[in-house]
Amino acid sequence: MKNINTRRSIRKYSDKEVSEKLLNRLFAEASRTQTMGNMQLYSAVVTRSEEVKEQLSPAHFNQPMVKQAPVVITICADFRRSTDWCLQRNADPGYNNFLSFMNAATDALLFTQTFCNLAEEEGLGLCFLGTTVYMPQMIIDTLHLPKLVMPVATLTVGWPAEEPALTDRLSTAAFVHQETYHEYTPEAIDEYYAEKEALPENREFVKINHKQTLAQIFTDIRYTRKDNEAMSAGFIEALKHQGFLPTDEE
């Protein structure tokens, strides 16, 4: 992957069409990624319709690229297809449980990342929307997802109309552990996060938000305890609704 060291998220796109032929080739190539038991426990819902993008937008906090991108792809953990196959072949599927969701979610995310790598090699720009798991029920309703199908990732896809700066990354020393996991000392934390904390844009974030540290930007503004707990509860309810967890009545 020659472009991996220069990849960045793209949030602005040109009007140039992303052809169905190209998308289908990328989907076929991405399907060669790793998958549990060769079951391919994922589905991709392609959205080009302005009307459906409008309906999806609130689930992604109305981020403008959802409506501006030529293509929006919602990738789902999918045990519905495999379950239907089993039922039609006199087999007893036992996939309405949390482990099966985790297996399907892993398959779906592997497929998603492989698709991203392939698409970026073709020159396409993408943005991975983590908001998919924040309000999944809205996406489920909009896309008419049946039981045992759960949205786990969304991509906005198009030809880039911007070239944003590369974002920083932690050094490998911060996340690679040899033989066993090693706890982080205060000195190591200081070392690993020093470069990130020193970036002018991050120092400005801290200043304009009247915070003491960059970490407080994450805990107090971007990913708060209140939001995490509320959206966790919503995600669990969606898993129940989709049949991956027992309901309170069961």
Where are these regions (language model features)?
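Acidic, surface-exposed loops and disordered segments
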Residues: 1-250
